[in-house]
Amino acid sequence: MYTEDGFELRPLGDTMEIYASGEIFHEPEPPVIRSIHRMQSHFPTGKLLCDVRLAAYILEPDEREERATQIADMLKDFTCAVICMTEQRNFIDHVVEKVVASQGKIRIFPSKAEARDWLESQPGTLPASRAHRPA
């Protein structure tokens, strides 16, 4: 498990679980994205479970667009299940649209159990960016 202010990463089976919490403000490169990339060298996986129910996105419209793009760029290489609250759906739906437009595989769920069930039914492939590492 890896914890930093605002998020926690937990490897579980063949899935990396990400728990975001607190107020999410504009940052040029969110620490969670850097941490997920770093964790791939220790726990290579193609599956992410992202629980954002405890996160509050405090962003201006242009910042929301930039954050959605940053998140989508990272998630597009994974099979991803997102758990969110109804009031977060607007932003999360926008992220999902961007991931799908990039040929990524992502779904939104209201509960962790449903998200885990779906992820377990998905093939456990590594992200394309990690699958062909030179020896």
Description of each model-found segment:
Residues 1-135:
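Amphipathic, Lys/Arg-enriched alpha-helical "gate/interface" segment within cytosolic domains
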